[in-house]
From Swiss-Prot:
Thermal response of activity: Optimum temperature is 40 degrees Celsius.
E.C. number(s) listed in UniProt: 3.2.1.8
Annotated catalysed reactions: Endohydrolysis of (1->4)-beta-D-xylosidic linkages in xylans
Subcellular localization, as worded in the UniProt entry: Secreted
Signal peptide: 1-23
Keyword ATP-binding: no
GO molecular function ontology, one term from the record: endo-1,4-beta-xylanase activity
This protein's name: Endo-1,4-beta-xylanase 1
Organism: Rhizopus oryzae (Mucormycosis agent)
Protein family per UniProt: Belongs to the glycosyl hydrolase 10 (cellulase F) family.
Domain GH10: 50-330
Cellular component GO terms held in the UniProt record: extracellular region
Keywords: Carbohydrate metabolism, Disulfide bond, Glycosidase, Hydrolase, Polysaccharide degradation, Secreted, Signal, Xylan degradation
Alphabetized InterPro entries for the sequence: GH10 (IPR044846), GH10_AS (IPR031158), GH10_dom (IPR001000), Glycoside_hydrolase_SF (IPR017853)
Length: 331
């Protein structure tokens, strides 16, 4: 049962002052309690965030908040194709190496993001028209990037945003040239590159159990798994509008029915960042056994891609919002 807002606020105040006494100065931590630690106490793997060299070296409060309050990191941009292989066969890992070193040094679980995506894709890839060429390019890219961090990345978003809103495959260079077989190629290559990593298919607008897009995801994943494609998890980005948190339970349960080992909330942000919405999403993951964790897509509002909607858990002064304390109280 989800506590009402009055209960959440009261409990949050009690825990805030208790946390100050037990966890050191709030100023150094930026929040009195780690929601990651409390989430893990319920048997989940992580409650995490994102980072890259630019944000880590910007406001010093960002790394302080990550170190103290979150247990997992995804790279916002540094592992995308345009960053790692801007020219064919010429790999650049400066940004992603920095990210991985920070995460490992601070004991954070790493999710790799992302290997095959139609966006932030160099033109030399998007202009390919030959099946053999594109297959070889995909295999080389996936293998090289994954082996760079073999044994260091818990899970990879192997393919990202491959569905249209009607549940059909998105038109992209990958689907145009290879059809849906690009999914098999990507996952089989990823499994070979790092057999221990969990392999995810990730998408947005999977926020209603009855939507055509979610149903398309489920039916395709069931089919691919039955055909032997090694898909371990489904990632729901969960970029929500205000008031949409209540649907998270139904959507995660529906995604879990596809037959993967895991599901995860991979890019969470919510317009207005209400306590109710955030607690609804946290409870949805707690209640679904296959949901291993939640990644919030940004630390503080100024760094959000949706900054004008104030969607994150820390405000413009990098102080925790009511939603952060409500999550801590609910846990």
């Amino acid at each position: 049962m989800i506590p009402n807002i009055t209960q959440l606020k009261t409990a949050a105040l009690v825990m805030l002052f208790a946390g100050q006494a037990l966890s050191g100065p709030v100023e150094s931590r930026q929040a009195s309690e780690s929601i990651d630690a409390k989430f893990k106490a319920h048997g989940k793997k992580y409650l995490g965030n994102i980072a890259d060299q630019g944000t880590l070296n910007g406001n010093p409060k960002t790394p302080a908040i990550i170190k103290a309050n979150f247990g997992q990191l995804s790279p916002e941009n540094s592992m995308k194709w345009d960053a790692t292989e801007p020219s064919q066969g010429q790999f650049s890992f400066a940004g992603s190496d920095y990210f991985v070193e920070f995460a490992e040094t601070n004991g954070k679980l790493i999710r790799g993001h992302t290997l095959v995506w139609h966006s932030q894709l160099p033109s030399w890839v998007s202009s390919i028209t030959d099946k053999t060429t594109l297959t070889d390019v995909m295999k080389n890219h996936i293998t090289t990037v994954m082996k760079q961090y073999k044994g260091k990345v818990y899970a990879w978003d192997v393919v990202n945003e491959i569905f249209e809103e009607d549940g059909t495959l998105r038109d992209s260079v990958f689907s145009r040239v290879l059809g849906e077989d690009f999914v098999r190629i990507a996952f089989e290559t990823a499994r070979e590159a790092d057999p221990e990593a969990k392999l995810y298919i990730n998408d947005y607008n999977l926020d209603s159990a009855t939507s055509a897009k979610l149903q398309g995801m489920v039916s395709h994943v069931k089919k691919w798994i039955a055909a032997g494609v090694p898909i371990d998890g489904i990632g729901s980005q969960t970029h929500l509008g205000a008031g949409a948190g209540a649907a998270a339970s139904g959507s995660l349960n529906a995604l879990a029915s596809a037959g993967t080992e895991e599901v995860a909330v991979t890019e969470l942000d919510i317009a207005g960042a209400s306590s109710t919405d955030y607690v609804d999403v946290v409870n949805a993951c707690l209640d679904q056994p296959k949901c291993v964790g939640i990644t919030v897509w940004g630390v503080a509002d100024p760094d959000s891609w949706r900054a004008d909607e104030s969607p994150l858990l820390f405000d413009a002064s990098y102080n925790p919002k009511e939603a952060y304390n409500a999550i801590a109280a609910a846990l």
